Amino acid sequence: MTNPPQAGSSRRTALKRIAATAAAAATAPLIGTVDPARAADAAAQQIGAAAWETLIDGNSFASRAALESEWNYLYPWGSDHNGTARMYASSTDNNHCYLSPAGVLNLKATRITWNEGNSSKDPYLPIHYHSAAVHAKNQVLVSDRYPNWEIRGEFQAPSARGTWPAFWITGANSWPPESDILEYKGDNRNWFNTYDGAWENTLVAVSSPGSWHEYRIWMTKTSGTDVQIHYYLDGAWKGAHTGSNFVGKTMNIIINLQMEGASGSSGPAGDTYYKARNVYVGRTNNG
């Protein structure tokens, strides 16, 4: 894993280290014909003298106060989405969104036994679960000023049929864009997805999704309209997608535990847990 610049580190060295990750990934299929070190130098020069800044430092789940300073409860648009879980969480309702131990966010889905109607969002499925979601107060915007972004976190994700955890970014004012950093849909395959009007998918079988794994993207501006997104699992590069027309589009960062829907019906009768820690967001700032 490439670490972000730390206090007291050389800005040039730190930026070169970050850039090397994307450069090495971009040249991975060409190893033997392209010098990765030279490619890393070129990528570092493209980043240039930009300053690296941290938006979420990895400690936002250390306490309830820290959580609420960096995250909002529910989806950006409310409690419902495209599955059968309705999100319930607030500063006074911690049944489905809580910290235990300190530093670990727990989202819990519980099956309900009463009729709560249907989701207000397409495809309007009947509500079978209460669960939780959070979205970051900081938003993602790729631009000339902010051309490079790193988003990562460690997760213990459920993967049983009917469970649908996600860690993703999506358009705040329009859809697309979307990038799914973590998404399990009822089995042990993580879906690294990019949506820009058409879907690009990289599916990776994960050994024990319920154990801690790190999921990460490096997103960089490649033109006046497009980005390239590199996807990583546990520090290993898994693929690169093009996000057309991502530039200039404000995006929300979301962690949620949805249920059923695309992950299959007849979900778990018992409680389902999705855990997160060390979530980090940083970017270059050209001033």
Positions of PLM-derived features:
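Short tryptophan-centered beta-strand motifs in secreted/extracellular beta-sheet-rich domains
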Residues: F61, W212-K221, I229-Y231
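Beta-strand acidic-aromatic groove motif in beta-rich domains, primarily in extracellular
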Residues: R161-I169, D226-V227
